[in-house]
Amino acid sequence: EFDNIVGSGSVTISAGQSVKTIEVAAKSDTANDPIDAITYTITGVTGDSTGAQLGEGLVKTVQINDNDAPDISWAVSAVTLEEDSGTVSVTATIDGSITKLSSSTININVNPSSDDTAVYGVDYEILELNQVSTFAGSGQTGSNDGIGSEAKFRRPDGSVLDASGNLYVADSDNNLIRKIDSSGNVTTWAGNGDWAHDRMEGPKLEVGFARPSFMAFDSAGNMYVAENGRQRISKIDTSGNVTHVSGNGDHGDAIGDKNSTQFRDIGGIVFDSNGNLFVVERNNHKIKKLVFDPSSGAATSSEFAGSGSYEYANGNGSDASFRHPWGIAIDSNDNLYVSDHNNHRIRKITPSADVSDFAGNGNWGQKDGSLLNARFRNPGPLTFDSNGDLWVADQGANTIIKIDISEGYVSKFAGKVGNNAHKDGSLDEAKFSRSMGLSINDSSIFIVDNESHRVRKIDLSPSITIPATQTSASITLKGIDDY
């Protein structure tokens, strides 16, 4: 078992030798672990050697796969639940307590009986799904790694999910990128935490980021990071190396190559299907587009939408105007959706840069309704789910909003309208605190609360999570009358 081990040592290559082998032996344990990894680097080479490296590269990683998945048993093999008639508890038990500080999550399926020929709508609800919980963070500022509430953040901003379901959070005031796996284990994934550090390129844990704020993955799995402390975009490639992509570090408004481009207060960033990166500029009130050279990979920026004036107008490209645009998301047809923060609207931008109103009537407030009759209160981050529906963190109201695209309807999904606060509980009673990050997959919504220094979670699919040191857990199904 190898868990969070950091160490160093020396290797001596004697005269006449050119290779020294380090052996790693995996030790068996009884815990159900995630995949462990040990990464080796070489530093401080001395003597007559002209250079030393690990194999063919400068970094090598050893992966240890776990073989201790627990056996799961159920209290009963099947249960029957009548519509609109009481509740039933489903309990899962594993064959031994989880000794490692992690949890096990078991996804379950709930189906109508085989002889049910008249199924309409949904005949049950999972009571535990209608809850907002704290996924990670103690609420106190700090940079501690750990499980759930053991971890600490300092004014975290944006978030993004990778293809494996890991959540990445821009821990802005810690100048770090944090990774949270499905069990809530928080680790420092990139950054040395030192804004003043003069190394802005290199291995990801040696680079000093400056207020990382928002992130996006390209189709190859490389992460792009908006650094608002330096007004630039950096890239973390799949080998863990950080390079400068765009932005010369000055607050301004200029386009061109990476050393000519200037940004002013970067908001959300997103890739289209052609590999172009769109960058929201909150205080330039516009969206820039980065196009990458297919040979060199160098990025060139251009104006895409927005006049730069703090106004409201629809139109094409620079004929349109925004007031402090904030978040950005993209649909399957490469249409962009931008939260126009101080116009209290969601704007739609086609691939040809035609800007129009998509949702919100422009009046400040929180009101459900059809797309252009609904009201927002300073909308912030937004993201699409796999069904093509758009979700919005309405920052001024401290609520999470769902926009049903097919129905053309806007409705509050979670959060009690009010000032910044922290409260877990039912969807209607939960409270949020300036949500800066919003990410969603098929099973969960993740909300990054900037002022409470926490990551919140809403479960969307039936699952049972057995906490560390426990052997069982339950969920409750309630029958409902759907017609």
Where are each of the predicted segments found?
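Short boundary segments that mark the start of a structured unit
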Residues: 1-128, 461-483
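Gly/Pro-rich loop segments of beta-rich domains
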Residues: 129-155, 185-213, 241-265, 297-326, ...
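Residue-level detector of Asp-centered blade-edge/turn motifs that repeat once per structural unit
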Residues: 161-164, 217-220, 271-274, 330-333, ...
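Short loop/turn segments immediately following beta-strands, especially the blade-tip
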Residues: 290-296, 406-407, 460
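Blade-level signature of beta-propeller repeat domains, shared across WD40, Kelch, NHL, RCC1
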Residues: 434-461
